From Swiss-Prot:
GO MF, one example: tagatose-bisphosphate aldolase activity
Gene encoding the protein: gatY
The protein's name: D-tagatose-1,6-bisphosphate aldolase subunit GatY
Residues that hold dihydroxyacetone phosphate according to the record: 181, 209-211, 230-233
Keyword Transport in annotation: no
Amino acid sequence: MYVVSTKQMLNNAQRGGYAVPAFNIHNLETMQVVVETAANLHAPVIIAGTPGTFTHAGTENLLALVSAMAKQYHHPLAIHLDHHTKFDDIAQKVRSGVRSVMIDASHLPFAQNISRVKEVVDFCHRFDVSVEAELGQLGGQEDDVQVNEADALYTNPVQAREFAEATGIDSLAVAIGTAHGMYASAPVLDFSRLENIRQWVNLPLVLHGASGLSTKDIQQTIKLGICKINVATELKNAFSQALKNYLTEHPEATDPRDYLQSAKSAMRDVVSKVIADCGCEGRA
């Protein structure tokens, strides 16, 4: 009942003019903070994990945790495969109970990207699983995948329509100037390109690389059709910096139940801000 597909979440966001944040989790504490904060704010959220996260924690363990926490807080949650590339890996996780998938074949030529994505869509839709795919490429690093800034490609609006129609995807991740990781300086987002994509594609649009973006930029992308905002690095940085600071100030600390509280508090601030920026408080 409480573990849901992202399709309805994002369709509701599209109709309501807000975005749903997708938080990449890396450990139990991150998931606790995201779910507790979302439940307190009655905000829809997506629990996202890269292949590395699923390998680290175990698919069955993550599914069990999401299900248990959704029931505990009486709060609907979606668990989402972020930047997955291998069909067999996706199929295994879908059969285990995952109901939302991002197949990332954006590094392939256009026709091959379509072919790879359509194969995943055809399989996933048999299980009522929603599928996101990316057209264009973001710079930066996600898991073990590194894309140099010079190799990053913006989404072509006309191709985006062809891509969406040919694959049957449920949401489209676009490249408009964001990158994975934190920014050394404020990025310049191509809002006119995003507006053009919105005119050609009637699907919920997804923005990756949102860590460190200004509130103004995030809210402008939502006005232009973004329905899902991905955040990963900002959570990791908040966690690790707070933990380092605490252990520096308290070198005698040995109990993780104590010294992880400062890290959880720092992440809670990030999650609350992202939910506010997305305008999704009270929408769950």
